[in-house]
Amino acid sequence: MSGRSVRAETRSRAKDDIKKVMAAIEKVRKWEKKWVTVGDTSLRIFKWVPVTDSKEKEKSKSNSSAAREPNGFPSDASANSSLLLEFQDENSNQSSVSDVYQLKVDSSTNSSPSPQQSESLSPAHTSDFRTDDSQPPTLGQEILEEPSLPSSEVADEPPTLTKEEPVPLETQVVEEEEDSGAPPLKRFCVDQPTVPQTASES
């Protein structure tokens, strides 16, 4: 009997966890792919991370425009980490917890902001700026080639198709035979009854 109650408790906890995650996802409307360090290791993965809305950034910027931290970053970075903390749960996986830890470490240890980091915090430049270009992969990881367009344009714009003139099948087959340099392939016709007979004889 105790096994059933444990399973029921686990199911109810899982349902609660799902509700929390879904509520957090509802709050986050934008996601972007970033290179993220996993835990205390040097391993970096390319994964989706939540981005706060520009309205929320403007509100927090107007509230804390006079209150800047000594390292030059606005206190908006703490709002980002608190949003990610809401997204976390005690039973969540390790990499998402390390994301929050990495954000806190980045915002507290940088003494002078680079121009790229200051651009990423201002809401006016968020659409033009790509953070994955500023973070190269570490050893052992492949460099992924991406189109030069921002991710929002790539996702929204369907691929354009160009119409080519149809080439007759006979000329196409002749060109293939000439290009390959190999002897011509045997062609079987469905209309001829000799093909199944030769196959059955051998």
Swiss-Prot record:
GO MF entries = actin binding
**Disordered: region residues:** 53-202
Low complexity bias locations? 107-123
The entry's note on the tissues where this protein occurs is: Ubiquitous.
Bias-annotated ranges (Polar residues): 90-99
Residues modified as Phosphoserine: S114, S118, S120, S122, S127, S148, S152
Record key words, sorted: Allergen, Apoptosis, Differentiation, Phosphoprotein, Williams-Beuren syndrome, Wnt signaling pathway
For this entry, list what GO says about its biological process.
Answer: apoptotic process; cell differentiation; chromatin remodeling; negative regulation of cell differentiation; positive regulation of cell population proliferation; positive regulation of double-strand break repair; positive regulation of stem cell population maintenance; regulation of G0 to G1 transition
What's its job? Positive regulator of apoptosis. Plays a role in the Wnt signaling pathway, negatively regulating the expression of Wnt signaling components CTNNB1 and HMGA1. Involved in cell cycle progression, maintenance of the nuclear structure and stem cell differentiation. May play a role in lung tumor development or progression.
* Full protein name: B-cell CLL/lymphoma 7 protein family member B
Q: What is the lineage of its organism?
A: Eukaryota, Metazoa, Chordata, Craniata, Vertebrata
